[in-house]
Amino acid sequence: MSNTTDSALWTAFIHVIQRDVQPAVGCTEPIALALASAIAASYLPAKAERIEARVSPNLMKNGMGVTVPGTGMVGLPIAAAVGALGGDPDGGLEVLKNLSSQQVVEAKAMLDRGDVRVDMQAGDEILFAEATLYHGDQWACVTIAGGHTQVVRIVINGNVLFELAPESPSEQVVCHAHDCLKQATARQVYQFATQVPFEQIAFILQAAKLNGALSQEGLTGNYGLHIGASLMRQRGRGLLVKDLLSDIMIRSAAASDARMGGALLPAMSNSGSGNQGIAATMPVVVVAEHVGASEEELARALILSHLMAIYIHNQLPTLSALCAATTAAMGAAAGMAWLLEPRYEPVALAIGSMIGDISGIICDGAANSCAMKVSTSVSAAYKAVLMALDSSGVTGNEGIVADDVDQSIANLCALACGAMRQTDSQIIEIMAHKCHCD
């Protein structure tokens, strides 16, 4: 490959990372609806009196069981209400960062009056959230689709104020980055992470800072299923040994506990998901601390982890029946393997072994239990790394794993894009029946 091609690809890689690795407060599916509400509210002459919202089945799935930051409540109605009454329309995934207790009280009162309604709407968009807010005879409707912060339409009192053109400049940039990832290989991701000038990737160290703080919050607070804190207590009872594997599990799970349990601290997300960002970050941070890695080595390992996770997720639907914490942890396996043995072969071998191990974990909606899947995924990642360091791994003779890691990834993603669509529909049907949403 020529230097010119390398330069163009590396520029695209940096753009993709900066686009897909972003701070986010709260689970990003309810946050997408909160953002739509906040933007719509900014066009009303006074506070919203009533909210009508529509979301795609997958967004409904990921918004039903997760705590909305600062509220102590789960579900999309409270997300829509606090977004309308206290959200920052310019905040993106941090729309609820400055939410006040008084605004939460007002939002809960709005729900109690029955002034918030969220319906499920099937359609072509997997990720879709639309909020229509009313004040007297004034109304504003904002539609987000295709991405957690991508506003595609704004309508004020029946007048279309904004509509995203299919070939707008922003869409062209996204498509270019998407095409670059489709044409790239895992080896090129590895080469970029290990060779790009440090100053161009130093920004990724913020992921360690944000997700590390979230992990500490999860260990000291009472969030979600408090899996990280529970595992830590079992150490004191002598039921769990203090070692690198348990550190990886505990610190990753604790960050997810806080994330899904409604902490107001931001997570550094990956591919629109805080849990994916956590799974791609915390195992790498723990191993980097263990080996005494330099700041540059940590940054390169984090870039390798996050970009590999993005590279894999780029072949998946935005939301699907495949638990994406598993694919993010494949990125973490790459980062950990490089820290322990800086060669491409262990990286590729570890990813293949993970595909042969945990590829069947389903996504049954964002919830506190996601922290369990995060802990499972990161422990599998470290196990795969240990095997790879011993030149051992799942081979191309077994299951969906191929001798080539890129083909193994393609095989896994083909399942999510094909047969698992029916699985996704069945999951949504079961969950809708549980809460009488159907």
From Swiss-Prot:
Leader peptide range in chain numbering: none
Any single biological process term in GO: L-cysteine catabolic process to pyruvate
One Pfam family from the record: SDH_alpha
Single Gene Ontology MF annotation: L-cysteine desulfhydrase activity
Domain of life: Bacteria
Family: Belongs to the UPF0597 family.
Protein name: UPF0597 protein YE0448
Organism field: Yersinia enterocolitica serotype O:8 / biotype 1B (strain NCTC 13174 / 8081)
